């Protein structure tokens, strides 16, 4: 059966990322991995201060003022050693993350997609590089619906007879792409194009649930916009091109 389908050219080819694209993905994913571990260490230091009743009067415990506070701490062992070791590890992670981000910025300047992506609300160097690396070749998606489905940001649909029940998002597809789009949506939520709709959804569904739903909705809108931008090689526009099936704004 498979041989017959292949002979008739009815078996779709499997798309594989190039070695260069795999390298780009690895760099952006490694950065996210380091950022995650840095956040864990920072939270651990904050937890140690709270456990011993130390107040943190500054907004950034790891800025200049916070470092002076940490240097003067009088903790019992082993907590003091753990806090100092955590600070050293955070400094090392800061250095490594900075190196990766500088590489991403240098490489992204000549990338075919990243400068276009950065014209959209909420997308900077890091997010743009992550989204571009995870999407790969935009021509493998025949429509914005296909790209949105690939991201896993579409709701699950359970069908029974003539009844369709929609659940949470499917989370199919690369989680790093989903992270990049959600990160962009959070930053774009204050943009004039999206702010009113975003706030309206939050008020309608409640602050906590409404914020998450509004972010997912905005991430899907940005995904649609990204498909048009990369397919037509044009910067972000507030509205879809003539003849498009939907608006690009929320």
Language model features with spans:
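Short, amphipathic alpha-helical segments that act as regulatory/interfacial helices
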Residues: 3-6, 28-31, 35-38, 42-50, ...
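Glycine-rich, often acidic, oxyanion-interacting loops/wings at catalytic, nucleic-acid
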Residues: 29-116, 176, 248-249
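Short alpha-helix plus adjacent loop in nuclease-associated cores
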Residues: 1-22, 26, 33, 66-72, ...
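Phosphate-backbone recognition surface of nucleic-acid-processing proteins
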Residues: 116-119, 125, 130-211, 246-249
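Short coil/turn segments at secondary-structure boundaries
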Residues: 16-17, 47-50, 58-63, 104, ...
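Basic, amphipathic alpha-helical segments enriched in Lys/Arg and hydrophobic/aromatic residues
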Residues: 205-250
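Short helix-capping/linker segments at secondary-structure and domain boundaries
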Residues: 9-12, 41-42, 97-98, 136-140, ...
């Amino acid at each position: 059966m498979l041989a017959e389908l292949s002979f008739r050219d009815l078996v779709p080819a499997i798309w594989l990322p190039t070695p260069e694209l795999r390298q780009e993905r690895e760099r952006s994913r490694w950065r996210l991995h380091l950022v995650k571990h840095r956040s864990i260490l920072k939270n651990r230091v904050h937890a140690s201060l709270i456990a011993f009743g130390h107040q943190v009067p500054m907004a950034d415990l790891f800025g200049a003022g916070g470092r002076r506070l940490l240097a003067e701490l009088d903790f019992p062992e082993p907590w003091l050693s753990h806090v100092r070791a955590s600070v050293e590890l955070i400094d090392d992670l800061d250095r490594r993350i900075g190196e990766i981000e500088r590489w991403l910025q240098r490489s992204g300047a000549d990338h075919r997609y990243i400068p276009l992506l950065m014209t959209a609300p909420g997308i900077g160097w890091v997010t743009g590089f992550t989204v571009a690396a995870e999407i790969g070749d935009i021509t493998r998606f025949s429509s914005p619906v296909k790209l949105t489905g690939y991201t896993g940001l579409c709701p699950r649909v359970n069908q029974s007879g003539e009844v369709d029940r929609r659940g949470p998002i499917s989370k199919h597809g690369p989680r790093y792409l989903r992270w990049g789009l959600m990160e962009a949506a959070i930053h774009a939520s204050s943009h004039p194009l999206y702010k009113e709709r975003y706030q309206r959804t939050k008020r309608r569904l409640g602050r906590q649930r409404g914020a998450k739903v509004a972010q997912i909705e905005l991430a899907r809108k940005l995904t649609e916009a990204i498909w048009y931008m990369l397919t037509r090689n044009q910067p972000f526009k507030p509205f879809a091109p003539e003849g498009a099936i939907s608006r690009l704004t929320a």
